[in-house]
């Protein structure tokens, strides 16, 4: 049975380097790894706890099912104002109110920019609060070297 990884780019930008990382991971995955590239961040409504009930918005339901069906998550996030993008945080907020889809799930975090350390730390803290398992990230210096 293949390992299923849900890969998410935290950017909506057309020429996003984080989306390029996610697409490269999908293209280079070994045969025993299935990469499900999630491209629905723009479709998610703004998080509102009052709307976190049945019937769920179809985009929210789709995100939750895809996280539930994944063995692990791979998130590549840009950094905006020393934090993660609003659309990525919005998606994570929708997972807080779910049925624990992300609890205990391994999550790998990467940033395509070498100076995105604040977003990495912010995202790691959010995911710890959500009880996911931090699978570590790739630390590198300003030149991109580990």
What kind of feature is each model-predicted range?
Residues 1-6, 133-146:
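Glycine-rich phosphate/pyrophosphate-binding loop and the adjoining helix
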Residues 2-30:
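N-terminal beta1-alpha1 ligand-phosphate binding loop
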Residues 4, 34, 106:
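Residues at the starts of beta-strands that form the adenosine-phosphate
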Residues 26-45:
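N-terminal glycine-rich anion-binding loop in soluble enzyme alpha/beta folds
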Residues 40-57:
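N-terminal beta-loop-helix "entrance" segment that forms/cooperates
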Residues 55-130:
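Helix-loop-strand module that forms the ligand-binding subsite of alpha/beta enzymes
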């Amino acid at each position: 049975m293949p390992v299923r990884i849900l890969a998410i780019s935290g950017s909506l930008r057309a020429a996003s380097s984080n989306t390029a990382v996610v697409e490269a991971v999908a293209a280079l995955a070994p045969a025993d790894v299935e990469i499900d590239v999630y491209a629905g961040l723009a479709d998610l409504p703004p998080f509102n706890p009052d709307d976190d009930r049945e019937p769920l918005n179809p985009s929210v339901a789709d995100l939750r099912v895809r996280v539930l069906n994944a063995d692990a998550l791979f998130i590549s996030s840009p950094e905006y104002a020393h934090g993660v993008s609003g659309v990525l945080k919005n998606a994570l907020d929708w997972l807080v109110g779910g049925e624990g889809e992300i609890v205990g799930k391994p999550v790998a975090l990467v940033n395509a920019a070498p100076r995105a350390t604040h977003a990495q730390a912010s995202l790691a803290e959010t995911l710890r609060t959500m009880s996911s398992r931090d699978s570590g990230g790739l630390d590198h210096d300003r030149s991109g070297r580990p």
